[in-house]
Amino acid sequence: MTQFTLSRRGLLGAASAVLLPSVACASTPKRKYDEITDVLVVGSGFAGMAAALAAAEAGAKVMVIEKMSVLGGNSAISGGMFAVPGSSVQKEQGIDDSPEKLMADMTRIGQGLGDPELIRFVCEKAAETFEWTRKTMGVEWNTHLTGKGGHSAPRCMVTKQGTGQGILGPCAEKLKALGVPLRTRVYMEKIFREEDGRVTGVQVRQGWRFGKPESGKVKTIGITRGIVLAFGGFGADVKYRKRLDPKLGEAFLTTNQPGATAEGLRMASRIGANVIQADWIQCLPSCSPAEKGMGMASHFATIAGSLFGVWVDSQTSRRFVDEFGDRKVCTDAILGVINRGGKALAVADQNGVDEMEVVRPGLVAKILKSGALRKFDSLKDLADAYQLDLKTLEGTVARYNELLASGKDKDFNRRFDKRAKALGKAPFYVSEMSPKVHHCMGGVATNVTTAVLDVETDQPIPGLFAAGECVGGIHGAVRIGACAVMDCLVNGRQAGLSAAKNKL
């Protein structure tokens, strides 16, 4: 694997310059709080819930606060897919994979911008954390292994429920059984850092309502061991993301829930947390313009379409990209099609849909019912519906089948799935694709213990930890699909353990 020697300071980009704070420490190290807990977790997605469970298991008194009216954040609406290199499931199925192989994938796709130590940690701890979700959380996984664009091996598994709720639900039940309060509509509006550098608590608004900044009753919560920041990314914050990347303005929809905004990152910055790589913002290329938010059709495009079918430019009736490419490659290619006045179409046949049924049972029927997926009895019907040139489309399918049979994609260098069959078994299925803002690769800088690093000293801020999408420096320029769940669960668990063991 290629080795990179850039320091964290060397990774600072334009986004960090925007966020450089003037550190405002409290005037007194002894502050009175309305309520005290050992560990406070801010956010209730995968990272936050994993942190809370790990801290509670370690014997800490834990509290979880969530600003929205429901738990889960983006995790609740995610596809619930976990990349696990070197898993027991892979070994049972005879698949050769390792943490080192995923490290190489993440480094390559991330353009070398991810911190090698952080990448190594999540990859090496993924299999152990996967078993923890099964045995401790009680998560049930569909053990049919699949891939996503950028992965060099089939290592991804989906919850049996088919969404992130398959993780959050069991974890919430465990936390309730342990007596951990899960408080919704509690908005963190200030982090207190003392003159000696320690973080000792937060100011919140209880009963807060989204969109009404001054709502709720002001309270303070102190901590004896640590705060875990797990408030997620800012994909729904148009003003903030546009400031970092002017291209991502109002014209771009998002897969994120409305609460994915940037104020948590600003608060961390104000007390001296280093914020890195915040201008690396990812789009999910395979989304349907016919659906709001994340939708369901993106799963068709990335499973049936990219593993077992083709993506076609409506203007040329030909393939236009490696369908199994990383998200930036695919997003740029799809936007190119759209900007030229065409439509980017994910096409699969019945074989592809049958394969998708194994990974996500029942989902195709739901997408068809929503109207975001269309079904055709023949290629001619499909071509007529989208004004494609039938002879060219038939040639595209024939060429794809020829390349598949040879085992080498000479046109786009796609890695063919071993289960893929010749494209041609009617009926045929199509979804239109239009990228939506999806994931923020930047955030607060941390070390492998998940301690948040100070912008001036590059040393841990005592009492402050972070995990999940609010952390930068792991994925680099591009995140590979299914690695967010891995990142959140591995680092969330570590953050909970680190906070529980910490003494202020």
Predicted regions and their residues:
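An anion/pyrophosphate-binding glycine-rich loop and adjacent beta-alpha core
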Residues: 265-270, 274-388
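Conserved N-terminal/central alpha/beta ligand/cofactor-binding core
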Residues: 67-181, 185-190, 198, 310-319, ...
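A conserved FAD-binding loop/helix module that cradles the flavin
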Residues: 249-256, 475-499
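Glycine-rich loop(s) and the adjacent beta-strand/alpha-helix scaffold that form part
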Residues: 209-210, 214-216, 222-288, 491-494
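N-terminal export signals
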Residues: 2-5, 10-27, 393
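Beta1/beta-strand and adjacent pyrophosphate-binding region of the FAD-binding site
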Residues: 33-45
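A glycine-rich dinucleotide-binding beta-alpha-beta segment and adjacent secondary-structure elements
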Residues: 392-478
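Conserved beta-strand-loop-beta-strand element in the redox core of flavoprotein oxidoreductases
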Residues: 193-220
